[in-house]
UniProtKB/Swiss-Prot annotation:
This is PAN2-PAN3 deadenylation complex catalytic subunit PAN2. The keyword Hydrolase applies. GO terms for cellular component: P-body; PAN complex. The lineage of its organism: Eukaryota, Fungi, Dikarya, Ascomycota, Pezizomycotina. Binds 2 metal cations per subunit in the catalytic exonuclease domain. Positively regulated by the regulatory subunit PAN3. Its main location: cytoplasm. Changing residue 899 to A: Abolishes nuclease activity. Gene3D superfamilies: Cysteine proteinases, Ribonuclease H-like superfamily/Ribonuclease H, YVTN repeat-like/Quinoprotein amine dehydrogenase. Keywords: Cytoplasm, Exonuclease, Hydrolase, Metal-binding, mRNA processing, Nuclease, Repeat, WD repeat. Residues 1098-1108 have a biased composition (Basic and acidic residues). It is an enzyme of class 3 (hydrolase). Residues 399-459, 1094-1170 are annotated as: Disordered.
Amino acid sequence: MDADWDEVTRIAYPAPGTNDFPRPATAVAFDPIAELLWAGFDRGRVCSFYGRDLTRYTAFKIQPASEGPVRQFLFHDKGVIVLGTRSVHMAMRRGPALWNIRHENMKDLRCMSFTSKGTQEIIVAGWQDTMLVIDVLKGDIIKQIPAQHHYSIMKKSRYICAATKTGSVDLIDPLSFKIVRSWQAHASYINDMDAQNDFIVTCGGSLKQQAAQTYMLDPYVNVFDLKNMASMKPMPFPPLAAHVRLHPRMLTTAIVTSQHGQMHVVDIMNPNSSTVRYANISSYVKLFEIAPSGEALVIGDADCNIHLWGSPTKIHFTDMAIPIELPEPEEPAPVLDWSIETPLSSIGLPYYREPLFSAWPADIISDVGAPPLQLEPSFVATLKQAEWGLYGKNTRNVRRNQVEDTRNTNKQSNALQAPKFLSERARESALSSGGDSSSDPQVDQEPEDPNEIESLKPEAPPLYRNLEIKYSKFGVDDFDFGYYNKTRYAGLENHIPNSYANSLLQLMHYTPLLRNMALQHAATACVSDLCLLCELGFVFDMLQKAEGATCQATNMFKALSGTPQAAPLGLLEEETHVPSLATMAQNLSRFLLEKIHNEYRTIPPISTALEQSLFNFPHPPTPDELVAKVLATSAVATIKCMNCRSETTRPGTTHVIDLLYPPPKTAGRGGRASKVTFSQVLKMGVERETTSKGWCSRCQRYQNLQMRKTIHSVPAVLVVNAGVSNQEHRKLWSTPGWLPEEIGIIVDQGQFFCFEGEDLKLHLQRGIHNITVYSLIGMVINIESHSPQKSHLVGIINVAHAEATPPGENKWHLFNDFSVRPVSAAEALTFNAAWKMPAVLLFQIKSANNKSNLDWKTNLDTSILYKDTNPNTEKKTYRTLDQERERPGPDTIVALDTEFVSLKQPEIQMNSDGERETIRPMSHALARVSVVRGQGENEGSAFIDDYIAIREPVVDYLTLYSGITASDLDPRTSKHNLVSLKTAYKKLWVLLNLGCKFLGHGLKQDFRVINIQVPRAQVIDTIEVFYLKSRLRKLSLAFLAWYLLKEDIQLETHDSIEDARTALKLYRKYLEFDDAGILEAMLEDIYKAGRATNFKPPRREDREKELQRQSTPPNSTAPNDCGAKPDGNGNENGGEPATPARKTGGITAPTFGAVNVFGTPSKASSPLPK
């Protein structure tokens, strides 16, 4: 290392995607053949960089993101060999793959090395019991070798030097692959190793504290002499050696690096003398490598930076570098003399062997011209004849000479037309002269023929197609969801990530047993951040309270995204490698049921009286007993070796049944193939007799193993994955009446029997066997649409089984995200092989239909309202409730306000008219929640003021509007006690289910970001009570506070406690005006004053100047209870509108009992807004 060596180039690792963050590299290597530096990352990504400037050259993936990081590079004349966790990949240097090898014995690969055959053969190993030898030229595995140890690092010298995970180094013969010698280099592990010529150098760590299991790097580098097969004197390195490399040119020189960037150039024969350099890094060194030329080295740090070191005048990577292939520059188009006389044939066409893109298939219809405009006969009758045609009064509400696109109009007649925005409809209704809006053509009409089955059509009809939410400048709240849903069953919005699961959530919600379990668990004291069972309970409660309004499962999907197992299982849309949504829904159903099984057992439920009587338990069931009875299929699997006939048994439980279809059979001579029923397919799926290859412990080799199941019990909720994978399966489902609405199941002596139709009726009449009848709750359906429509999932559910009282008839409904409409049973149970196939089916025992356990509402765990997890006793902005004296209930009013931050900026594009069109609105996250007492002696005092710990990246803290800064939400710098979103949400959810009334200003947006559904009877919104519908404008909190309360709020920023208190004072004003009978007059005065100030409170400086010009200054005032000030005549509300004496008497302070400090105001003093 010459004296002029320094950092030459520093670049940041590229991000794996546009919406992702850069990640540290997991492997780096210099190419010995080309002037390239290669880097591998944790999601299977590989990048290469060219020259001293590290210009990005190529990038590609070697494996799915879920399989882990890139481990190591080796280089061949024909390309680069990359080692992944479960695969080995070889690619050309410009990117195209040469081969990719995957094998069942590749479980956790860590290292690889060339063998005695040079670069024609490699051996790969890892933390696994098998090493594999690969022919590089053929790309095949030619040998498998049992590994005596698990290896982490391999280097090739005279021997293959392999470092084990326990701190030793094995010298492996590169020809026979046998261990020649072992050397214990370090006590615990080896962090880095290099081998060249006659030397091996290692640095590692040792266990320093046995009790605490604390490891520390060793302050030396061990050296082993391969020529004499003996250890040499260690090289001391006080800064703790993290990485080491032997110099490729100077045979006895090593470069040692610490984690903090201190580098020593040491002579192995004279370790006491060294040259020291310091790398300028802000974190710690993760990777270190030296170039084959010895004239460059690279450092990779934890801050995702690459540091290239070398001499600025001599730096190069390899001595005999081959030139790299660069993209060929595009040839400029030839200049043509293009004029009217130029024949098109002079352009010519290139020679081709494949069909051109312009050769469209004959089945593609091209639009030519447009159909004539269809005029109403009544309109034509009013026209008058002239020499040049007909003329008359324009009564069609179109502009003169306006061209109408009749082609697109006819096309849209076959689809669900998007409704008008709510603001647009309100404006049109207000401006219409007659006020008659009944002629709106966008009314959702029922089909003319109710007996028509839409599922028999060759393509997906409009009611099954994918729906999109349109956004105006007012955001998603301006979209008319009611246009798509005129039932009392709530839909779910589909513009949030992972909303493919909407149909599965709806299906589980209308299964009474699952809904009971989720709500019982949510009502307990569980505050686990990633408890999906709690989130399911919150979603089910929202859907129940919505009464037809559209909901969203944002918090549920956030918890799902935060679950570590979700991404590897392919359950997340943004990271999935699963080929279809149907497969994702099936995987999600299995995952959710396992989570329910595990999480339900953690905390005993509120009450199990209903389940005890339903399942005839002799005692109150434990959580384990109940969840096993509801969800688990208990069976014993018998595995038989077809060679030695030995049998082994293995008990187990499953939560989901995968249907197993029989192989297709051809009809015999003169006969028909036997009919396959759903019951037979279900039986095969439950018992599942299969034959596959497996290890036989008696034969000590792989043999054909036959497995069959002996069924002991089936659950009360039967979740079935359809597993439709070929055309034969589609034909079965397309058979009319193939799926029954009821099935009967008998489990007798390990045998599973299933009956349907007439067979089921016959067994029920006989009454010989104990048969359990199951009702079909519903299905998740995969709608396979073609371009431009996208394939998606819908739910078809019989909601009659979830009603509080049995309706006496089936009530099938189609849940297409936020579109909900009733369908007939024939429509629900008819499938189409072309576009409508089931993905998940759900059955429940018939005796559990319409059984809702509502005990959780009366036994709700409210301890979270009285717990204070804030360790700071000083400067608290709130005081928690007193458990002895403050007990919220149905008569309690609480004032609520929240603050948000932005997670994603809105996506906006320009349409063909040059107007800005919102594709995706801004995405918000809850940052602060404040709840203020609305009654009692502590009225106006906050009892909740939570700041939320946000896991997602925040793009804008909206400080001007929220008062939130980056330091408020950073756990390292925040002066507030940050809580999880689950904790803050559960406090509000408990208040909601205690019956409290939420008071605030513009609560609709608060509830949307909180993701909670509050019934109208529990909402008091001051933006609605001080609103005139005829004015089409809602008033801000700051303006109302200035005009009615004479208070200036939100001067510099927002504070949620201040806003909640102000809303509470405004509500008290509203009660005064309403009680005095002057509410309408006051609203007119407010709007009149708003027009004079543009509905904004005047600035304080302007008002002070106005007061200085008055001849008589106003008297000093003192605030009263509502923030009002008396004027000079002794009247209250000095400068504000006076409130005359009430007709029914003054406001009486609420009386408080010995327990409820919140109090119960009289009905006359607290009417809800109408």
